[in-house]
Amino acid sequence: MEIQQTHRKINRPLVSLALVGALVSITPQQSHAAFFTTVIIPAIVGGIATGAAVGTVSGLLGWGLKQAEEANKTPDKPDKVWRIQAGKGFNEFPNKEYDLYRSLLSSKIDGGWDWGNAATHYWVKGGQWNKLEVDMKDAVGTYNLSGLRNFTGGDLDVNMQKATLRLGQFNGNSFTSYKDSADRTTRVDFNAKNILIDNFLEINNRVGSGAGRKASSTVLTLQASEGITSSKNAEISLYDGATLNLASNSVKLMGNVWMGRLQYVGAYLAPSYSTINTSKVTGEVNFNHLTVGDHNAAQAGIIASNKTHIGTLDLWQSAGLNIIAPPEGGYKDKPKDKPSNTTQNNANNNQQNSAQNNSNTQVINPPNSAQKTEIQPTQVIDGPFAGGKDTVVNIDRINTNADGTIKVGGYKASLTTNAAHLHIGKGGINLSNQASGRTLLVENLTGNITVDGPLRVNNQVGGYALAGSSANFEFKAGTDTKNGTATFNNDISLGRFVNLKVDAHTANFKGIDTGNGGFNTLDFSGVTGKVNINKLITASTNVAVKNFNINELVVKTNGVSVGEYTHFSEDIGSQSRINTVRLETGTRSIFSGGVKFKSGEKLVIDEFYYSPWNYFDARNIKNVEITRKFASSTPENPWGTSKLMFNNLTLGQNAVMDYSQFSNLTIQGDFINNQGTINYLVRGGQVATLNVGNAAAMFFSNNVDSATGFYQPLMKINSAQDLIKNKEHVLLKAKIIGYGNVSLGTNSISNVNLIEQFKERLALYNNNNRMDICVVRNTDDIKACGTAIGNQSMVNNPDNYKYLIGKAWKNIGISKTANGSKISVYYLGNSTPTEKGGNTTNLPTNTTSNVRSANNALAQNAPFAQPSATPNLVAINQHDFGTIESVFELANRSKDIDTLYANSGAQGRDLLQTLLIDSHDAGYARQMIDNTSTGEITKQLNAATTTLNNIASLEHKTSSLQTLSLSNAMILNSRLVNLSRRHTNNIDSFAQRLQALKDQKFASLESAAEVLYQFAPKYEKPTNVWANAIGGTSLNNGGNASLYGTSAGVDAYLNGEVEAIVGGFGSYGYSSFNNQANSLNSGANNTNFGVYSRIFANQHEFDFEAQGALGSDQSSLNFKSALLRDLNQSYNYLAYSAATRASYGYDFAFFRNALVLKPSVGVSYNHLGSTNFKSNSNQVALKNGSSSQHLFNASANVEARYYYGDTSYFYMNAGVLQEFANFGSSNAVSLNTFKVNAAHNPLSTHARVMMGGELKLAKEVFLNLGFVYLHNLISNIGHFASNLGMRYSF
């Protein structure tokens, strides 16, 4: 039979992705590791190694018991074997091309039409149970096989080892099988010198559309002594049950190799299994493009050679690929068991059975029994094995494909191997994510994993997922050996809800960035050794890791949410280290984030840099040690506080800690200063006390700073000249403080000598000059001492103080206290050295002459050194000392006082006094005004007072409630309009409902009444359940407020003795506010609830309404200028309102009652109020501010209603509301001593217009829409709201 020679590619039938996607979503995802290690590996070793399964490799990776049994299945015995031998002529022309089918095969291959599958297929002459052997071992030249499609068996063996085989010159080839009761396997073997694949090649495909008989299994073996290649257009497709054996010196497949391809509708319902065996390839196997899965849970296996290269690997979302590398030394043949001499054994058994035992009990078993025992050969089953040390799997890029099918827990694609090295190139990995989430597992059971490229989600580096649909990367190295290494040589950037899991002995990362939005999990809990990360950037990230080494940890806040931490959620062990910690500055205090640790024995940090509004909570780690630096990353601009929390903290040798009130350091356990230095930063004339929850230890040595000649200090106070005088400044407090000299090996809590040695290592500096002790060796030292203590005479005339040369002088204006519970200094002011004033000691002349230490014999009890001594301050200026005016005068800017009053008034002046003087001191105030021009000061004060006045305003505090109430007023008016359709019903309800069913037919029911009830619309006023989405905004010169939310209710028309409408509602709205300067931001949750009614008396309508509202507001002040930064804070309060309304109106009906005009008048009462402010600030906190107001209003309105059809309507309502009385009380807002009184609002006049309507969508289902605008004609504030909703009648 002729075969097709035209150029064709395979045409696959279309399938319903929606149908099969829904079905496959309920198929449970199974782990294939168990089959890999307990079934597949033994099958390989017991099958290939023994040679018992030659040609049956389809069983080696069958992914189930049946497939494992196939590994050792002997080939099916053919009924008849046809043999063809190439005779003379085929061995004479090496450059000639032949058509293999026409030249040799056609005489023993039949073909015909398969009516069940509507396609032509071919088979060995006589039937699929026969075999064809073609002997061409001496043939030369090139033999083309093209168009042999749907070859369904039996076996075909072509030996042409000196010739070239070209598959698919004009058309592709497909080798497959028929599934019958014999469950036969089709085996096709080609043995050639070279094999070229130029067109599609299919293995175990279904014939035609695939709707008919299923294929069983097919094994295609291609063996070439030199090489096997395919072109880019030659696609090789392996369907369920397909095996491809490749044996050659090298294999290079440039076209796509598709394992687990689908062909027919319904194939999605079950996974597919396919295998490629390259174990007999001596060189490298190269797959340019390998695809596993086709919208199905395909499971594929490659029995690999030593080196396997894959350009692009495409995995379907639920597919799995296993690449099995050979063991060290390759597969070895095993000895075959010798058959037992069963006849002799049986004879011996019979003799023994007929004999009498020692207990005279005879075994009844007659001799020469026909019962035979057949002993089978012993089967040797090997367990899992590691790939040889030189086995490598290289994949340039891995990509997963997905559809929108939703499955609980998502889908997982997997790549598993046992090679010594699994290397993923610079193309990296792309995970296609969809709803319910997707996971990619890359696993090397016995070796290492290296990834050179990035990790992408939906083809984006840093791509994100959605909550509940996370994208997950999983890597497992050395799962069985527990000795694998996972290495990532490219920076990893993970978007929101993208997770990374790594199990290995050692994991190495160049960089990981989860700071793009947070909500990530880095699960390294399966790393048994060390996790090494060069740079880790986090934001609200869950990090599960133990025993790590992080070169740099950067913690962002990103304003994700209040209290969103990066959480190290595993015990970090005792060998964890971070070289540098950087806490980035938060956006504002309510958006603070940070990092916390679950538990751990010890954490070593080399350098620690903290920032405002960020947290570091290590209280659950037993010990933390700082080895080099502990400082603020924003020391020149400390505009917010950090929160740093430790259990036991150690400052290592030569480490430096910068400490101020902005550090906000908590040590709940012990603190050890092991020869480090604490730099105390003076802010506002004070230093912050370092409080230790339990014990503190100060360990020092006799080491000398070669640059200064002083002992290396343990505590330093920088800018000590700015300390407030006549005040004790406590540096450290603890339950117990001990002191120790590590050079001498002594330590004690109360040893006087050790305490005095410690005091010499407590230093006060003015810039770089020490001011508590001066060591004078020459005139330059005299000048330096004068600079330190502020003595200009010593600087200008050092010769007058030459008597100090060779001596150490102690500044007795500074006293130091060190005992078992406190370390402090007391600054009276600098004393002045005199020639006979004492307080000096001679410098030693030995080898330690450079050491600047003061002798204990120095006077320490001078009268002016006592804490009780206070200087006599005298006001030398026009204004009292300590006022903001005095600060301007001392700065020689007296005229700016008048400018301040003229432009900012007394309120601005009082605010400046509070911010600079009352909350700090005159020194701080002087620094602020020196750095700020007068114009800028008044500008900032005016902006602040405007904002504070807005905060105090009850109108501002209840603005969101008013907008929500306005939205509901519009909705309620729409409901009343709808239920007031009293004039258009000209026929009774029964007749009207019957009219609606005209010309309709129904199945026989029990009664006509049942038909009427089930199918006719309800024209009587029914009970209605309604819901609306609402939105609104408030606009004025100071800023704008917006609101969005939902409202729902139920109402009904009562038609008894009294015609009336009654209803109730509830609503929720979230509002936000931003002023124009963006210095005031608010967010509030608001609720509104109430009842409404309308009573009819002929054309008269009486409306009544009562409602209440409550709002919880969270606001923050965010001034950017340094002058106002103390105002920045978060605060909250509650706002509430209650209202009752009553109105009367009269209906005028026109146009056959379709148009109704209704004028109305009404009165209302409103009660508005707010609670006191609660602030998180400890500097200038907002307090008090509660308000209450009662309003009485009168209104006049006119309304037009237009009813059309049986259910739809449109209306417009316009009116004026006039306040005729208001009274109330308010508690002034306070900022320390500064007060802000809420202004009393005048009586207001409001104009309002609203319109809306409703449209029927389906039986008893309606859509409504409305708009409303309210304008205060006095304050020029406008409120706008709209709604979109649904109603259901029943």
Swiss-Prot record:
The record, for PROSITE patterns, names: AUTOTRANSPORTER
What start and end residues bound the annotated signal peptide?
A: 1-33
For bias type Polar residues, the affected ranges are 363-374
Region Disordered: list its residue ranges.
326-374
Tell me if Membrane is a UniProt keyword of this record: yes
Q: Where is the composition biased (Basic and acidic residues)?
A: 330-339
Q: Does the keyword Signal apply?
A: yes
Q: Which InterPro entries match?
A: Autotransporte_beta, Autotransporte_beta_dom_sf, Vacuolating_cytotoxin
- Compositional bias annotation for Low complexity: 340-362
SMART domains documented for this protein: Autotransporter
**Annotated Gene Ontology cellular component terms:** cell outer membrane; cell surface; extracellular region; periplasmic space
Citing just one GO molecular function, the answer is: toxin activity
Keywords annotated in UniProt: Cell outer membrane, Membrane, Periplasm, Secreted, Signal, Toxin, Transmembrane, Transmembrane beta strand, Virulence
Locate the Autotransporter domain: which residues?
1018-1290
Description of its domains: The signal peptide, cleaved at the inner membrane, guides the autotransporter protein to the periplasmic space. Then, insertion of the C-terminal translocator domain in the outer membrane forms a hydrophilic pore for the translocation of the passenger domain to the bacterial cell surface, with subsequent cleavage.
The function of this protein is: Induces vacuolation of eukaryotic cells. Causes ulceration and gastric lesions.
- What is the name attached to this protein's record? Vacuolating cytotoxin autotransporter
What is the native source organism of this protein? Helicobacter pylori (strain ATCC 700392 / 26695) (Campylobacter pylori)
